[in-house]
Amino acid sequence: HYGDFRFRQIEILYNMARMDSAEAHNWLKDNLFQQRVDARKKQEYKAKFKGQERADWKEIQTEWMKYCLMLKYRDNALFRKDLFACRGKLPVEDATKTNYASNLFWGARLIELEGKKYYFGCNVLGKLLAQLRDNGGKLEYKLPEDLHLFGKPVINL
């Protein structure tokens, strides 16, 4: 949860920070907080608030993801259990069945090369998950001071 708001998926909170608009934040809250995120709703959100994306989104998205992952770690015992179950291994965010270019940043796609299978991609999410697990739920992050949700500064963790 974030403050008084509970949501089913951390992806909702992650997407809130993409837009610099209290109206966009409230739309997400009203439309997605208690539902699973699906690609159609995400595209609707992006289209509805096109032009309101933070100018620095590409620069801050990884820092914001760290924040979101720490919240999930704090609030979700099953998530913590799953992370510790793969101790010593690097989690892979499998993007094999997706077509979004950003998924090769956050994850990796399984490819075959000369008869061997490899994951190709940056797998930033997998690396962050390993750091989160290995650091007891803490990640260093730096967010801009003007990052607000629902018109208020982001809650410190």
Residue ranges and their predicted role:
Residues 1-157:
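Charged, low-complexity intrinsically disordered segments
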